Amino acid sequence: MSVGSVFNRLWARITHDRSIGFGLEHIGLTTLRYPRAIALAVLAFSILCFAYIPRANVDGDLMRVYAHSGQYYDAYEHLSDTFGTFENDIYVLVSSPRLTEPETLERVRELAFDLELNDYAVGTMSPFTLRKPDGLGNSVPAVPEGMDDFAEVAIALADLQQNDPMMRNLITPDLSGMVLIVFPNQEMTKGDGTKAMIASVRETIAYYADENISIELTGPPIWTSEMLAAAVNDQIKFTVWGFALGAVIALLALRSLPAALLVTATPLLAVMWSMGTVILFFGSFSFLTIIVTTLVLVISFAESMFFIFNWLAYWRDGMEPNKAVDATVKLVGPAAALTMLTTFVSFASLALTPGQGVREFAMAGAMGTFLLFVCLMTFMPLMLKAVIRLGFKPPRRSSLVLTAPLPLAWFIASRFGRPLSIAAIVVTILLLIPYGLIQPRFSFEDMLAKQSNALTTAEQIDDGVGGVAPLYIRVPLAGTDPNVDDTDFETIRRVHEILESHIGENKVISAANLSNYTETGFSREEVFDSVGPFMRKRFITDDGSQALVTGFMPTIISSATLKQLVQDVTTEMEAAGIVGAEIGGLRGLTTFGTDQIVSGLQLDLTLSVLVNLGLIGFAFQSFRVALASAIPNLFPVLGTEAWLYFTGQGLQLTTVLALTIAFGIAVDDTVHFLSHYLHSRREEGRTHMDAVKHTLDRIGGAIVATTIILCSGVVIVTFSELPQVALFGTLFVSTLAFAVIGDLFILPALLAAGGKFFQPLGRIRVRTADHDATPDDPTGDTITGTGGTEGHSQPG
């Protein structure tokens, strides 16, 4: 055989001598030919995945979402490594109306010392741990010990709160509350250590809380623990309710409990495979990858419903049930493979945006999509043939609810196809305007669990002494004096003043605060020695080359306000001749980093749309098919983004994720519709309009059923305790709801209106179904009957 001949055959395989599923449906054909071998493989892989499921856990590290996402994460990591930050600290708010009574003050002092001795703490900062020079080369407690008079305590605390820059951030102005900050041991808090640390701290404070003293915890570790608890609760809720709703809807649609259980079995196994694989590859779920199991669940339900509907229709057409299984694999398999590829592309496109969290979500989703297709092509045929042997009897008919919209859809398509098509095209083009104008928007509050007690406590601290959402400025110094020379001290003082002018008086701490002591005659070395090496590192590096200025902002601040603040502070520092200063912190990372990630994801969404439309056109070897699929699938995505734009919600992280994945899934129904339409034209010889009507009758009910299952399964997500996850569910459901309008009304109208334009589709060379011989179907018969969703005849 010549090289040219080999090349021609290879080229033909790539272009037209193949199915629309690029041959991936041969996984199903292999199952039909070698059922025992495939059954063993399915069993072995299931055992592997089941072995990993008991290890399932959710990683509460918020940094996993932003890790390696770009310059803002790198700056935060460098800042944390150089100085340590307050982002991992636990804030303890102690409140008492009798705080100025000596007995109460000493009890709070004991609490502060107990927290310092906690196994998980490497240090604390509180009014009791701060010390000041005594003028004799030693230091004494900033809050004097041994006071036994109410007035003496009140005068001492008031003096510290009003005159000591550090104490202003730890003692409330009305002297009714104090903030104690616990610095955790980062090595001990890795993995499940944070949960154990919080439990240990709660155990410590429980001894001191009574009717006189109220103690509450807040800070990033508490926030993430609440988010983690909400995420775990969500995972259980989504899985249980998703299965329950899917099964109930399948029961109502098929009007048969055994048939509903058949629809449910494949999604159950697909979710188990997906969970086991995520744990195998990533070790744990993140706040993003936990959504993947719900997506795999609902997509599996949708594909299972398509498979069961087609199988029952063949059976009702009079085909022998085992042969009907084979025929369904050959007809549905190529379309299912193509829908898997479009969803796979939607997930995979997200990996182009930097960030460990997004890339893990993309990889987990892509793997889950492929696994559910494999499950559909292996487990489903094996299960159906097994239940046939056990005497399964199909339901006599499906629910009339599923087919109720079909006569209206055909009436509109046949009578008003052209005006509806023109309107759909014009509206879709106009919706491109808000798509290009919409901007990222970030709200830190949306990341936290709803009704967060820790958030309420943080807001109380904001109102009292400062904030628990620090903004940091890393200031490069010219000298190398570990105790800071006069020139460098002036640089620190100037940055301190600039930041304080923007976030409020007494909301900033830095080495400049020490001037309160140096002005009374103490040297900087004496003052630095008195605060101790741990606190010293929060002000300046050991070699004196860098300083840290920390501003405590309100916990809840809009992203627009924060961006403007950073811009103004940067401009003023540059005007003051301070070069190389770097602003960072968790709030800066989540605000600017999220904007960067969201902008990248918006480009990924655009790329996903273009690639998927191109993939559909290439799969069918027809640009006409790509054009036919464009409007019904662009309309729901662009419509949802327009709603976000006009309501001022903007783009958020989960917004773009939801739209990208929803587009990939919405394309599924379109692919199944076009596949059946072209099968009717090419292989059954139907006319153009007859093929449109036959396709609408044959799979319209399945499209309605799958959309109901998809929306019902994901609507559970809208009740998540995490606002970002709830928003994901809301947008996902609304996009799919619009998509069913596109597939049942707009797509048939486009096909009907473009009769001459779509006429050549009857001559496409790629196969919409396979005709390979299998044991129960040696002739490769995939001709569909004329009885629509219900088939031509009732099986006995």
Each language-model region and where it sits:
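Signature of alpha-helical transmembrane segments and their immediate interfacial
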Residues: 5-60, 381-386, 390, 394-443, ...
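Juxtamembrane segments of multi-pass membrane proteins
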Residues: 65, 71, 77-78, 82-85, ...
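Extracytoplasmic
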Residues: 77, 106, 149-256, 493, ...
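Interfacial segments of transmembrane alpha-helices in multi-pass membrane proteins
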Residues: 233-285, 352-356, 603-648, 719-720
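Pore- and gate-forming transmembrane helices of large, multi-pass membrane proteins
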Residues: 235-237, 264, 303, 316-353, ...
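Hydrophobic, glycine/alanine-rich multi-pass transmembrane helices and their short helix-loop junctions
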Residues: 249, 337-378, 613-617, 639-650, ...
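Hydrophobic transmembrane alpha-helices and their membrane-interface caps
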Residues: 259-307, 625-674, 742-745, 752, ...
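Hydrophobic alpha-helical segments
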Residues: 270, 274-390, 720
